[in-house]
């Protein structure tokens, strides 16, 4: 059990993955994430460390490669934020997602809540013929 919460250096390490480098191991995730972690992003919601690790493994497996670059980290009390850029290579095409993660640290110092905020639709469907035009039209009508 950890006595101190996850540090900025720990988050820098967790949220940095160059192309061609392996993702963190299950033991690495378990060192920093609570067994009952809640994970939410624009595409899914998972409860528990094993479900979180499974979600990360599935992302890596369905991509040719993944990168994650950290830009800024802030921790105040039991809350942390990480600004990042994620790149996914799928069938030779690269998709870039800028985003932010909000983390809540539990009494044991581990991450008990992890929520990712990023635009899934624009970078995913924008480059696709026909879907890209529809996505941009929807954005122009309802978002921009």
In which residue ranges do the predicted regions lie?
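Intrinsically disordered, low-complexity regulatory regions of eukaryotic regulatory proteins
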Residues: 2, 39, 114-117
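Flexible interhelical turns and helix-capping residues at alpha-helix boundaries
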Residues: 19-22, 41, 92
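Residue-level preference for long, well-ordered alpha-helices that form the structural scaffold
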Residues: 4-7, 48, 135
């Amino acid at each position: 059990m950890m006595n101190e919460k996850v540090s900025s250096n720990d988050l820098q390490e967790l949220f940095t993955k160059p192309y061609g480098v392996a993702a963190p191991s299950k033991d690495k995730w378990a060192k920093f994430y609570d067994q009952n972690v809640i994970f939410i992003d624009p595409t899914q919601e998972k409860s528990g460390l094993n479900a979180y690790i499974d979600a990360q493994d599935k992302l890596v497996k369905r991509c040719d490669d993944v990168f994650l670059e950290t830009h800024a980290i802030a921790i105040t009390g039991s809350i942390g934020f990480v600004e990042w850029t994620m790149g996914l290579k799928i069938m030779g095409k690269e998709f870039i997602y800028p985003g932010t993660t909000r983390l809540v640290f539990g009494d044991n110092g581990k991450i008990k809540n992890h929520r990712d905020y990023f635009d899934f639709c624009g970078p995913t469907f924008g480059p696709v013929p026909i879907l890209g035009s529809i996505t941009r039209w929807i954005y122009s009508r309802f978002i921009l």
